[in-house]
Amino acid sequence: MEGKKEIDFSKKFNSLMGENNTYEFFLKMQYVMPKYSKKKDPIFFSFLIFAIEHLAKYKEDESISSLFIQSMQLYLKNHPDKKIENPSYFMNTYHKIYKMIPVKSDKSLFKYNYLELCDANGISEDDILKENIYYEFAVDSRENKFLLEGYKFAMKSMKLDIINDVVKDILETDKYKMDEKEKKIFVARTCLEILVNKDKKMALDFILPFINAKDNYETNEPLCNMAYFICLLLNDKNVTFEKFKEIINMYKPNIEKVDILLKKYINKISFDNYNQLVFPEANNPLSGFNIMGMMKLVGNLSNLMRGN
């Protein structure tokens, strides 16, 4: 028996296919999406890809993001078996759509909406990491010069190559008006953040290019030296908390000049490795410190999220 004929969506919506009708096209897609979201995979995804491809042709990035999120919410609602049990299914769908958006486009809205949808549907951080989503987001943000957004995703990806690339770009640009000392503090903070994420070897590999061992390390920014020595200690299983604290106390005057956040990084690292705190007085809730310390150094929240 002959199979069902594929739907020619371009013929079906021909009157809205012109360049001057993109908004009307988008509204029509929104209107008919509830109907198509009830269809089986081939029809639904054929329709969704048709709509996204047309909007991508005219670089309608916000419309793409909005339509994708709406369509997936409806689809997951109508097909609950696809909801949480198979996160890779949703990831694969995302990949198909994401690659249709022009490379030189602001995909920020798409990224944040996508991550919200993952969270709402029980897709874990581990699943996102396995699919290299954060890495892809970071690469894209960097290519589009949204460096602080790229930094955020690079740090979440925990891939050293993209972390190095984004940090290098941030240090070389005049956009954030950092002097040389602030740049070195930013490097030290990044190293500590990698340690907070519990990758001791990566932290050491990251900080090494910024360390000059000549003249007893005196030509380096003190906080870079501190980050380097912390990495060395943590990579040695025989080092005690007392030795760790001794190194921190050597640099306490330098730490005091930065902000309370640096102490929270050190506390988190100390607690994870030795189950003790170096700065008990700074032990307020540790949530929300990940990117916020860098924000104080290089820009406000809106700049951070949009990379402006």
PLM ranges: what are they?
Residues 3-11, 23-27, 128-132, 144, ...:
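Amphipathic alpha-helical repeat elements characteristic of tetratricopeptide repeat
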Residues 1-85:
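Eukaryote-specific detector of the first structured module of a protein
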Residues 9, 146-308:
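Structured C-terminal portions of repeat-based eukaryotic scaffold domains
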Residues 23, 31, 36, 58, ...:
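Sequence-level detector for tyrosine residue identity
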Residues 16, 36, 55-56, 141, ...:
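Hydrophobic side-chain positions on well-ordered alpha-helices
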